């Protein structure tokens, strides 16, 4: 008898069919919110911080380039991360290596950056430090840290423009809701923009949060004021 387990059943039909072919039909489900109620997982709150941007773009890639390269925005985001890190270890997930590098340059010795180019042992050494650290910031690409790592002592999870993929968003939050001896709650920070495509993607994510029973609030921030 073989059991197939997954924490995230895809919503897109083609992704679901690939999973169905590998594992077979779904025979039972237990949601993260149920595990939170049972005390197995840490409770969470999603803080959506929507940076006010007045730039307009005709396609998503041009918009992303602006969101990840505008120096003033990056200064603001780095400042937010440093502030929330005062409450405990922080994991920051980014989509692009360039964005991770820019944030790292703004945080100095308070942060480390890991990506696919970082050797596996070096990545693991940084992850292991979280077990005893009190104010460590790990900046990582979604590709290396969104799944498959165990970091229970993350008290703040920052998602920088996480997009509209159900699997990516929910699996990323899964990095933060693992419990530790000194942790039963995690703050999730969804950093996004008022730009056209980012706003559409946020609408999708808010639907994901509602479905998962993750409480959330939205705050707009004029970073250029």
Spell out what each predicted region is.
Residues 8-9, 164-188, 205-207:
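Conserved SF2 helicase motif VI
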Residues 55-106:
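Conserved interdomain hinge at the start of the Helicase C-terminal
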Residues 139-140, 147-162, 168-171, 186-190:
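A short beta-strand element within the Helicase C-terminal
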Residues 7-12, 34-41, 50-54, 98, ...:
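Conserved nucleotide-binding/hydrolysis micro-motifs of P-loop NTPases
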Residues 91, 101-102, 108-146, 168:
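Conserved helicase ATPase core of P-loop NTP-dependent helicases/translocases
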Residues 86-89, 135, 154:
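Short, high-confidence coil segments that cap the C-terminus of an alpha-helix
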Residues 179, 195-225:
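Helicase-associated low-complexity regulatory tails and linkers flanking the ATPase motor
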């Amino acid at each position: 008898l073989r059991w197939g387990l997954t924490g995230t059943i895809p919503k897109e039909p083609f992704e679901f069919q690939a999973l169905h072919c590998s594992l077979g039909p779904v025979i039972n489900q237990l949601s993260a919110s149920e595990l939170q109620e049972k005390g197995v997982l840490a409770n969470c709150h999603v803080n959506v911080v929507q940076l006010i941007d007045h730039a307009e773009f005709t396609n998503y890639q041009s918009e992303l380039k602006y969101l990840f390269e505008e120096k003033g925005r990056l200064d603001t985001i780095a400042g937010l991360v440093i502030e929330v890190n005062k409450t405990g270890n922080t994991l920051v997930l980014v989509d692009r290596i360039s964005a991770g590098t820019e944030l790292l340059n703004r945080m100095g010795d308070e942060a480390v950056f890991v990506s696919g180019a970082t050797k596996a042992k070096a990545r693991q050494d940084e992850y292991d430090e979280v077990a005893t650290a009190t104010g460590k910031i790990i900046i990582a690409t979604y590709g290396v840290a969104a799944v498959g790592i165990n970091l229970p002592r993350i008290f703040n999870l920052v998602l920088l423009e996480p997009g509209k993929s159900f699997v990516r968003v929910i699996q990323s939050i899964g990095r933060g809701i693992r419990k530790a001896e000194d942790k039963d709650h995690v703050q999730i920070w969804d950093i996004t923009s008022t730009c056209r495509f980012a706003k559409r993607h946020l609408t999708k994510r808010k639907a994901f949060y509602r479905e998962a029973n993750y409480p959330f609030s939205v705050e707009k921030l004029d970073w250029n004021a």
